[in-house]
Amino acid sequence: MPKLLNYLFSKGVSTVKLPAPVPPEDWRGIPALTDAECSSGCNDCAAVCPTDAITMIGGGDKPEIAIDLGACIQCGLCFAECPTGTIVENKTFRVAATSREDLVLVNDRARVPEVLAKSNLVPKKTPGPPNIPDSKIFKDSLHARVVSTGCSSCDAEIGASSNPVFDVERFGLHIVASPRHADALFITGPVSKAMQSPLERCYGAMAEPKIVVAIGTCAISGGVHKGGYASANGADAVLPVNVYIPGCPPHPWSIIHGVLVAMGKMEPFKPEIQKKVDSKAIEVKSQ
């Protein structure tokens, strides 16, 4: 015991304070678009994307790229293969959005439905809730029930967000065992057929008002399982979703950002957050 106490006192407080620290060099971020134009006829990025998250719009001399972050698994192949610097890496933890459309990066916002059509292989629950219901209710505490529908990686990151380094509970989040005690439903995985009915029953057992948070690319669009016979291709094919946290899996800081967005304490990710600069760098507001 004396050795343990000496170790703990010598290390001090392990919990990292907000704002989140600068991501390490070896941490892979999300794709981002720059002002650099694509080469004529080039579709290298779309060809290597394992989840069809990249759509080539138009063609000819000036093709345009659209990136669906809700389908992106952050493999890094697109910005590694891009010969013109049109796609670069954006090292940011703040990726949680309150709208599926906000996860689509494209210059012409009118093209967003066209891009999402690739991910929406099955009808979605519409209309979904446009905003988080009366978020002031949740600003001090949020009790969440986690339902895993086939993704242990995202479950592990949710667990990591509760460790002494990240300590998500200091912001008021508490994981509960019963949906009757929950304000929020955290969903991970592509929602397999066997889990659709239990998921709906869990949602039905929750009292109003309630929030649904899709954690991870699988829960948003199906991820690498998209189009599989046993996958619903995302949680919003079964339930209305309020907050989307992309990533495969998302970093604990990204999960914390999503939690704070759900509680009304932080602003969600928006496409206009990204300031286009040049082909070699990208600046992000509010890092």
Predicted features, each with a name:
Residues 1-19, 79-172, 178, 276-278, ...:
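Flanking helices and flexible, charged tails adjoining ferredoxin-like Fe-S electron-transfer domains
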Residues 1-48, 52-55:
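Ferredoxin-type iron-sulfur electron-transfer modules and their immediate structural context
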Residues 33, 42-73, 77-104:
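Iron-sulfur cluster-binding cysteine motifs and their immediate structural context
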Residues 35-36, 69, 90-92, 108, ...:
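Fold-independent oxyanion-binding glycine-rich loops
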Residues 37-52, 70-84, 145-160, 217-224, ...:
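Local cysteine-cluster metal-coordination motifs and their immediate loop/turn environment
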Residues 50, 152, 204, 208, ...:
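Generic secondary-structure signature for well-ordered alpha-helical cores
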Residues 155-165, 170-254:
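Cofactor-cradling patches in redox/metallo enzymes
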Residues 227, 231-287:
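C-terminal functional extensions of proteins
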